[in-house]
């Protein structure tokens, strides 16, 4: 079984997901998405006194912006992680601004939805990001490489090899399926204004299970750009 295979590989000194590779990044995506969603939810509860769902997906408490941010941050800044703190901060500052800007453009172009708008804040860039949050991205990069990623990486490497690989495939399949369903719900939601009557079984299912009021509860901070 899987446990026997794990024992055999561990006896041979094989470590799961050593270094930076696909398996480790999948686990980083999963853990960061989950923790990011929890952190955002707590932050909004404390600052806005509101219990707001912050998940990017239809299913589960996963913030894809945090997850992808952690993965891309790890890949993009892996060369500077051993440099001084200022270099890491500056790299994270610019990386975060570009990443947040592109995420905003992507959701608007492909889904017709706006999940955040910083137009009311000073030093914003097209309302998609601003200097304050870019500063936070710099801090996040510094904290990530100095305090979070090293112990997280070691923890992931302690997962039994076969178990870790099997779970990585399951996580990947779940995120892909969840992403497809979420995308279909978003596209149907923005297209419902021009085409209120479902044209096929899939659209009918989405209309039945995810009408506008349900979508509003899923993403209460979202703006429908077509409205």
List the predicted regions and their residue ranges.
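Aromatic-rich, lipid-facing transmembrane alpha helices and their immediate juxtamembrane interface loops
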Residues: 1-227
